[in-house]
């Protein structure tokens, strides 16, 4: 379905520079877009692509349109039509959502015959329950929820209105998922936290005893508009709940330990690991494969770059890095050799300083 720029602006705002009746039926990158597609410029370093794109129209910020120079109607190359908006990237995201919704007919409400639903569960008439879904006693499935094939919902768990669980996602007993959650395939919410008490006697080969499992009797509470990536795991609390606040976005294969609290609007990239009882503030950004130790607190607006390790609390907003970026292999070997010899170099410097001091050289 194609829409005019005028229709888009009525729905999403912005100003038109060019032909308001220009129609676009989809989105594409600047370097691949055709005359019936809408592109966007989010990074000024790609401004040259705007000049050469074949897109029917481009989403662009006012300052970037000024840099582009020529007026829309007077251009002889590149697009003649623009939607001018302060945040082209967010505008693009909303338009993309709209096109997806228009192209995807809603599934009919109902329960697939192969689903297993306990008589004590409550399932809204508007819910969509797919093949081989299991819903245990006391669970509540609210209006408009979609549970795809093989989803498991444990006893006493509530799934908020408008949420969508993709195939093979699982949410254990006693959890609360807020409205409009998106939970991708293979994600697990509410599995046991990693809690074991040591009960050992003796040392070495004479050591006896074992690890005693600590029952995890808390749950998981997830706020509205949260998205959880594929194969991500969020452990239930040991006594109190693990809490994911509103509008948190979690990538694939992330581990969140028991009793964590993730503040609203925080984003966590793939393969990050967050140990138990850690609190992360609001509007934080956690890079891919970052590791955060347990029992630490990150303040609001903290950014942890990819592969960084966090071993202590970081209460102040800012960007924190501990990862070593990739370099030429030979350079790495040289640096590693220097690191191994730092203690020897330190002792040599101390000896030289002492010798200079003995000779009065430090006064020179």
Swiss-Prot record:
SUPFAM superfamilies: Trimeric LpxA-like enzymes. One of its GO terms (molecular function) is N-acyltransferase activity. Its EC number is 2.3.1.191. It catalyses: a UDP-3-O-[(3R)-3-hydroxyacyl]-alpha-D-glucosamine + a (3R)-hydroxyacyl-[ACP] = a UDP-2-N,3-O-bis[(3R)-3-hydroxyacyl]-alpha-D-glucosamine + holo-[ACP] + H(+). Keywords: Acyltransferase, Lipid A biosynthesis, Lipid biosynthesis, Lipid metabolism, Repeat, Transferase. Disulfide bonds: none annotated. Pathway: Bacterial outer membrane biogenesis; LPS lipid A biosynthesis. PANTHER family: UDP-3-O-ACYLGLUCOSAMINE N-ACYLTRANSFERASE, UDP-3-O-ACYLGLUCOSAMINE N-ACYLTRANSFERASE 1, MITOCHONDRIAL-RELATED. Homotrimer. NCBIfam families: lipid_A_lpxD, PRK00892.1. HAMAP family: LpxD. This is UDP-3-O-acylglucosamine N-acyltransferase. It comes from Burkholderia orbicola (strain MC0-3). The lineage of its organism: Bacteria, Pseudomonadati, Pseudomonadota, Betaproteobacteria, Burkholderiales.
């Amino acid at each position: 379905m194609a829409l005019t720029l005028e229709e888009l602006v009525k729905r999403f705002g912005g100003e038109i520079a060019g032909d308001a009746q220009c129609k676009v039926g989809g989105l594409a990158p600047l370097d691949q877009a055709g005359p019936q597609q809408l592109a966007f410029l989010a990074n000024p370093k790609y401004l040259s692509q705007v000049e050469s794109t074949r897109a029917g129209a481009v989403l662009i910020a006012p300052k970037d349109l000024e840099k582009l120079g020529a007026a829309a109607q007077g251009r002889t190359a590149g697009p003649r039509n623009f939607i001018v908006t302060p945040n082209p990237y967010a505008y693009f995201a909303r338009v993309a959502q709209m096109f997806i919704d228009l192209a995807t007919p809603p599934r009919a409400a109902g329960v697939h015959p192969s689903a297993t639903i306990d008589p004590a569960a409550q399932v809204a008439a508007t819910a969509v329950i797919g093949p081989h879904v299991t819903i245990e006693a006391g669970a509540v499935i609210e209006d408009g929820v979609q549970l795809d094939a093989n989803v498991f919902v444990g006893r006493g768990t509530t799934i908020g209105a408008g949420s969508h669980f993709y195939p093979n996602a699982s949410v254990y007993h006693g959890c609360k998922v807020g409205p409009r959650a998106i939970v991708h395939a293979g994600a697990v919410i509410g599995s046991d936290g990693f809690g074991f008490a040591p009960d050992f006697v003796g040392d070495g080969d004479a050591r006896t005893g074992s690890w005693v499992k600590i029952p995890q009797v808390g749950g998981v509470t997830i706020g509205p508009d949260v998205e959880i990536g594929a194969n991500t795991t969020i452990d239930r609390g040991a006594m109190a709940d693990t809490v994911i606040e509103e509008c948190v976005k979690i990538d694939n294969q992330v581990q969140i330990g028991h009793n964590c609290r993730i503040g609203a609007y925080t984003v966590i990239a793939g393969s990050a690991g967050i140990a138990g009882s850690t609190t992360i503030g609001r509007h934080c950004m956690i890079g891919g494969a970052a590791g955060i130790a347990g029992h630490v607190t990150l303040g609001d607006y903290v950014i942890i770059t990819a592969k960084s390790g966090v071993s202590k609390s970081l209460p102040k907003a800012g960007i924190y890095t501990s990862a070593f970026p990739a370099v030429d292999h030979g350079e790495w070997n040289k640096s590693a050799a220097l690191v191994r010899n730092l203690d020897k170099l330190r002792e040599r410097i101390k000896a030289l300083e002492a010798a200079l001091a003995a000779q009065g050289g430090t006064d020179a």
